[in-house]
Amino acid sequence: MAKAPSWAGVGALAYKAPEALWPAEAVMDGTMEDSEAVQRATALIEQRLAQEEENEKLRGDARQKLPMDLLVLEDEKHHGAQSAALQKVKGQERVRKTSLDLRREIIDVGGIQNLIELRKKRKQKKRDALAASHEPPPEPEEITGPVDEETFLKAAVEGKMKVIEKFLADGGSADTCDQFRRTALHRASLEGHMEILEKLLDNGATVDFQDRLDCTAMHWACRGGHLEVVKLLQSHGADTNVRDKLLSTPLHVAVRTGQVEIVEHFLSLGLEINARDREGDTALHDAVRLNRYKIIKLLLLHGADMMTKNLAGKTPTDLVQLWQADTRHALEHPEPGAEHNGLEGPNDSGRETPQPVPAQ
């Protein structure tokens, strides 16, 4: 059997020279339980599953944290809905993919498939038990004691209606907020808890209450991707053109976070499609920068201006010269039926992302 090239220091899963690697024949041997091959395979699988558990925890933690720093909003503008924790996960996944691909070239993965499946089932049972232990306790049938402000705000995230009702019934303000001026309305809008939102609004919650970054519930609903929340807030008079500290409208936020249905809804309302933020960027600038293919199509078909310059003097067409060939084609040929010209995103079309093209 030909020797594989020597690899060393490949991210978190460094590999020894081929002489130290166990051959495929050992995996398939009838005495696999007693072999060094099984021990190494088991260690590799344990490491892989442990990494997956860590990644899931990071993703969950990131989803629970509301960005309340101006730098985080700026990062959302330029890079989309991401966080440092999720970027770390992506980097680890790339390393792991490379390492596992190398391992597959050296051993017969099929020979340990049963072992992998067995380990996964055991790990899944542990994860299920852990998740059950971390679930918020169920609401009591009746809340007798007083509800403090912190519990009230937490209930808006967790969807605990009885806690919300008790706080309001005892005279608590629906506009109660934390140190970041985040109200229960902001929190419930991000999570999509419709019944709680209706209760808060019926009890006088200020629909356009702005937090420390001037974000309203409408901004948070766009981040959460909840179209039904957007419509509910609108029905209570929410301003769909309100600006945060970056002068971003809800349309800007929906574009940056990739919420296609919300973008389509806003455009159907006839909102100011060419509204500019603090850097002079329109929604189309953001969509091009972040390669939001479907959103680019929607904006163009609704009349977005391709020649609007931002404060750096760049139009969306200028920006796309640095990015994707398909996107540039969309800007230059915004005809109906553009869904056939490659505007669907990589996840929709199944095609590889085209390489950037040089400016002409």
Swiss-Prot record:
Ranges annotated as biased composition (Basic and acidic residues): 330-342
Regions of compositional bias (Acidic residues) in chain numbering: 138-147
Residues that bear Phosphoserine: S99
Main location (coarse class): cytoplasm
ANK repeats: 147-176, 180-209, 213-242, 246-275, 279-308
Renumbered residue ranges of the record's region Disordered: 126-147, 330-360
Keyword Phosphoprotein: yes
Cross-referenced InterPro entries: Ankyrin_rpt, Ankyrin_rpt-contain_sf
Chain segments annotated as coiled-coil in the UniProt record: none
Tissues in which the protein is found: Mostly expressed in skeletal and cardiac muscles. Found in slow fibers. Also expressed in kidney, but to a lower extent (at protein level).
Post-translational modification remark: Phosphorylation at Ser-99 by PKB/AKT2 in response to oxidative stress induces translocation to the nucleus and negatively regulates myoblast differentiation.
Biological process terms in GO annotation: muscle contraction; muscle organ development; negative regulation of myoblast differentiation; negative regulation of transcription by RNA polymerase II; regulation of transcription by RNA polymerase II
Positions of the UniProt region annotated as May mediate interaction with PML, p53/TP53 and YBX1: 5-120
Assembly mode: Interacts with ID3; both proteins cooperate in myoblast differentiation. Interacts with TTN/titin. Interacts (via ANK repeats) with TCAP; the interaction is direct. Interacts with TJP1 (via PDZ domains). Interacts with PML; the interaction is direct. Interacts with p53/TP53. Interacts with YBX1. Interacts with AKT2.
Descriptive protein name: Ankyrin repeat domain-containing protein 2
Organism: Homo sapiens (Human)
